Each structure stands twice: as C-alpha cells, then as structure tokens.
UniProtKB/Swiss-Prot annotation:
<dbReference type="GO" id="GO:0006412">
    <property type="term" value="P:translation"/>
</dbReference>
<dbReference type="GO" id="GO:0003735">
    <property type="term" value="F:structural constituent of ribosome"/>
</dbReference>
<comment type="similarity">
    <text>Belongs to the universal ribosomal protein uL18 family.</text>
</comment>
<dbReference type="InterPro" id="IPR004389">
    <property type="entry name" value="Ribosomal_uL18_bac-type"/>
</dbReference>
<keyword id="KW-0694">RNA-binding</keyword>
<dbReference type="GO" id="GO:0022625">
    <property type="term" value="C:cytosolic large ribosomal subunit"/>
</dbReference>
<dbReference type="GO" id="GO:0008097">
    <property type="term" value="F:5S rRNA binding"/>
</dbReference>
<keyword id="KW-0689">Ribosomal protein</keyword>
<protein>
    <recommendedName>
        <fullName>Large ribosomal subunit protein uL18</fullName>
    </recommendedName>
</protein>
<comment type="function">
    <text>This is one of the proteins that bind and probably mediate the attachment of the 5S RNA into the large ribosomal subunit, where it forms part of the central protuberance.</text>
</comment>
<keyword id="KW-0699">rRNA-binding</keyword>
<comment type="subunit">
    <text>Part of the 50S ribosomal subunit; part of the 5S rRNA/L5/L18/L25 subcomplex. Contacts the 5S and 23S rRNAs.</text>
</comment>
<dbReference type="InterPro" id="IPR005484">
    <property type="entry name" value="Ribosomal_uL18_bac/euk"/>
</dbReference>
<keyword id="KW-0687">Ribonucleoprotein</keyword>
<dbReference type="Pfam" id="PF00861">
    <property type="entry name" value="Ribosomal_L18p"/>
</dbReference>
Amino acid sequence: MSVQILGKGKKVALKRRHARLRKHISGTPELPRLVVTRSNRHMVAQIIDDTKGVTLVSESTLTSDFAGFEGTKTEAAKKVGELIAKKAQDAGITAVVFDRGGNKYHGRVAAVAEGAREGGLAL
C-alpha cells in the first residue's frame, strides 16, 4: 500500500514522512502506539490501539494538569511524557511503540519520549 502525497512545503513534507513511518509502525493490544503531535504552542500525546482504532490514554498541555504551569515548552513536553506514562501504567500499559509523527526526534518530541521513559514506560 503506497501513499502518494504530492506538493512542496513543510506541512506536505511532514505528512510524507509520517506516511512513510506508518508503513512500519502500528499499535497492537500488547504493544500500543505512542503518538506525539506537536504544534507551535502545545504538545499532545496519545496511546492508540490500531487494531481496534481506539485511543487508550491521552495527555496534552491543554488539560487541567497544566493550569498555572510556568516553564519552557520543552519542560512542558517532558511533563506531558511523565503524565502519559503515569496514566498508561494505571491502565496496565508498560511498553509502547513510539510514533514521532513525521517530526524530527529532537527538542520537544524527544522531551516527551524522555519524560515517558523516566515515568517508567518502555519505548
């Protein structure tokens, strides 16, 4: 199954990279997928079971856990990783497949992964 995404620009390149990644990465009930979505202001992390098409756990900088949070965007991303690891362990999830969503494994995306590892989640 090949996905053809045509065009130029950052958003198109991001979608092309993500489509390439998704050919190899998929979440199962035993090993769900940790998806990281990055915007200019916020970070969203979701743990997804692709066989059922269900989001098992999610965490974001938009949730009430971040009310009054003061720090850099990278520190917030690390906290998102720690919080999703805690929620995953409460749901009985110990290991996941990391899906960087076409973004480089650098900066805030890497901070989410680092926070999840420190929270006890195996990537």
